């Protein structure tokens, strides 16, 4: 597995590459996620397909990954609703660069943890560029999300969903709806998607790199 760093349109990108990758994973990451990338890649060593993973920098998590504006759920930082700008970067800059490196026929899948998982689901309602979505503990509690996704279908055919089995016990009443929301999201996808819902032991803030690795590896096995 080779690792390299480069900058694209003002964003740092970390690229991991197997020999002759057949699938390419895209993952938005903040500083904490970046520190865990090596461990995530190690947890993916038994993936069904040789792969590449491009992790791209997100500096303002709540602003850049939220599909529309929403008030703060915890703390004082609101959601800025700039996901469309982030998706523009992916479609207009990152994918063309990666096609140049790996060829036009490589399969792209998008995924991430928490709000990045929600971004991945949302992005797949806006474009058919992705073969799969790996949404590990996605923030499907986000205000307005369930109404939106009932009217806007995920275009990727393979979707992985997961949640920690203690996440729906959150003290925050909005975040505590995540269990009901993930079950409803799963039910919506069952009719015409290859989809799974995995329950992980524990709360939201643990094993994010292992959970994300499992999400990507399930996608690799499903789209292969």
Which positions does each model-derived feature cover?
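Conserved hydrolase catalytic core segment
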Residues: 122-132
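The feature captures the conserved acid-bearing segment of alpha/beta-hydrolase catalytic domains
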Residues: 140-219
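A conserved amphipathic alpha-helix that caps or lines the catalytic cleft of carbohydrate-
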Residues: 41-44, 123-124, 186
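Gly/Ala-rich beta-loop-alpha elbow adjacent to hydrolase catalytic centers
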Residues: 111-116, 120
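A short, hydrophobic beta-strand element of the alpha/beta-hydrolase
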Residues: 134-136
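N-terminal cap/lid segment of alpha/beta-hydrolase-fold proteins
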Residues: 1-17
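Serine-hydrolase catalytic machinery in alpha/beta-hydrolase-like enzymes
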Residues: 12-14, 19-101
């Amino acid at each position: 597995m080779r690792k390299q760093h480069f900058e694209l349109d003002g964003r740092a990108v970390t690229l991991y590459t197997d020999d002759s990758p057949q699938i390419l994973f895209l993952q938005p990451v903040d500083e904490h996620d970046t520190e865990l990338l090596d461990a995530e890649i190690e947890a993916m060593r038994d993936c069904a397909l040789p792969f590449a993973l491009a992790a791209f920098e997100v500096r303002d998590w709540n602003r850049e990954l939220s599909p529309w504006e929403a008030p703060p759920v915890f703390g004082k930082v609101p959601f800025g609703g700039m996901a469309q700008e982030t998706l523009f970067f992916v479609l207009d800059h990152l994918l063309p660069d990666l096609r140049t490196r790996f060829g036009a026929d490589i399969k792209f899948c998008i995924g991430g943890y928490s709000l990045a998982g929600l971004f991945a689901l949302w992005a797949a309602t806006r474009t058919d560029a992705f073969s799969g979505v790996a949404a590990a503990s996605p923030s499907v509690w986000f205000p307005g999300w369930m109404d939106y996704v009932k009217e806007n279908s995920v275009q990727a055919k393979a979707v992985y969903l997961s949640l920690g089995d203690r996440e729906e016990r959150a003290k925050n009443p909005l975040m505590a709806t995540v269990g009901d929301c993930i079950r409803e999201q799963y039910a919506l996808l069952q009719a015409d998607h290859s989809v799974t819902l995995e329950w992980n032991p524990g709360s939201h803030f643990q094993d994010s790199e292992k959970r994300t690795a499992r999400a990507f590896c399930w996608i690799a096995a499903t789209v292969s």
